[in-house]
Amino acid sequence: APECGERASGKRCPNGKCCSQWGYCGTTDNYCGQGCQSQCDYWRCGRDFGGRLCEEDMCCSKYGWCGYSDDHCEDGCQSQCD
């Protein structure tokens, strides 16, 4: 049964996870990408997203994406860079 969104009476996912077009919670592009119903910016951060910090202490890259790679945590990193 759907966990969130229209098919679940508008319920939101826990821990800021995205609600997919099919009503399931997750954090990958399948949930947060096209058709996402709510909390679709889970992987987004930084100045273009109201200064939002990443979940789980991930780094915020210069392009506003959350992750743990050197591309996220080094040159131009916006927050939680160490």
Swiss-Prot record:
PROSITE patterns in the record: CHIT_BIND_I_1, CHIT_BIND_I_2
Origin: domain of life: Eukaryota
Pfam family, one: Chitin_bind_1
Gene3D superfamilies in the record: Endochitinase-like
Domain Chitin-binding type-1, residue spans: 1-42, 43-82
Keyword flag Repeat: yes
Coiled coil: none
UniProt-listed PANTHER family: CHITIN-BINDING LECTIN 1
The protein's role, per its UniProt record: N-acetyl-D-glucosamine binding lectin. Shows no hemagglutinating activity towards rabbit erythrocytes and weak activity towards trypsin-treated erythrocytes. Has mitogenic activity towards human peripheral blood lymphocytes (HPBL).
Protein's name according to its UniProt entry: Lectin-D2
Species: Phytolacca americana
Lineage, opening ranks: Eukaryota, Viridiplantae, Streptophyta, Embryophyta, Tracheophyta
